[in-house]
Amino acid sequence: MSSSMSTLRNQFLIAMPHLKDPNFEGTISYICDHNDEGAMGIVINRPLDIRLSDMLAQLELGGEGIAMPVYSGGPVQIERGFVLHSPLGDWQSSIEIAPDICITTSKDILEAMARGVGPDRTLVALGYAGWGAGQLEKEISNNFWITCPADSAIIFRTPDSEKVVSALGRVGIDYHRLSSISGHA
């Protein structure tokens, strides 16, 4: 991470309209970690054709009737589960990213969710988005991404189809006016 760019932890990363990478076209990611070694985020607007109840059943945890979607969190380690949630709770592998947003990777949170005693707000994803040292900074300087402050309401309560527009609207940007052609002034 260059000294000119502060951490992007607890920020949204929004794909510019000209970014045509199928893994990220039209996405909004929540950045969970960002340091000199790289960055890690979860795509929060790409639901898969699997419900949480299906995933919990595959893990033999029960949870029948939980209609919540499971998301494609990104192209890295797509077999690994990540739960963004609020509040923190007492799970084995949790990291507080912001006062109202945590990430957990341990099975105990899924067990609690199956029993109906999990966190109040959750987003379950398979896989994550990862960038090596300096890679994300270079992509941002090449106008592939817009960053803006994260908001837990957008992660947990905004419909998927509205997340990008809502996040950009919070900082005064109209997504529909963004150019699909990149460049530098």
UniProtKB/Swiss-Prot annotation:
The family database entries (InterPro entries) matched by this protein are listed as: AlgH-like (IPR003774)
Look up the domain of life of the source.
Bacteria
Q: Which Pfam families match?
A: DUF179 (PF02622)
A GO CC term attached to the entry: cytosol
Protein family: Belongs to the UPF0301 (AlgH) family.
Record-given protein name: UPF0301 protein HCH_00550
Organism source for this protein?
Hahella chejuensis (strain KCTC 2396)
